[in-house]
Amino acid sequence: MIVCTTENIAGYRIDKTFGEVFGLTTRSRNLVRTFGAGLKTLVGGEVVTWTQLQDQARLEAIERLKNNADKIGANAVTMMRFDSNEANGIMSVVAYGTAVKVSEL
């Protein structure tokens, strides 16, 4: 499955457009790690726990995006983007784009 952030894929032509497709994940933070991360904000620097959580969520959202595109017959996703939201220690990440069927030129 090809996933790109551009409208076109070099070396391929778009044969069919299926439309919007997305992958969503929602994760909660570990209370102990959140407390430790809160202490880290007092001294500055990267909050590794939160970075890892966001990275895992983005990877999971992309995998779900690919699975959803595959289910409708697409073999690529163009114009892929991320959106995220966090409230009360719960983080949602969505990967979305346009599901397409492509073939090599």
Swiss-Prot record:
Organism: Oenococcus oeni (strain ATCC BAA-331 / PSU-1)
SUPFAM superfamilies (UniProt xref): YbjQ-like
A Pfam family annotated for this UniProt entry: YbjQ_1
The organism's taxonomic lineage, starting at the top: Bacteria, Bacillati, Bacillota, Bacilli, Lactobacillales
Family membership: Belongs to the UPF0145 family.
InterPro entries in alphabetical order: UPF0145_dom_sf (IPR035439), UPF0145_YbjQ-like (IPR002765)
Protein name: UPF0145 protein OEOE_0637
Top-rank taxon, per record: Bacteria
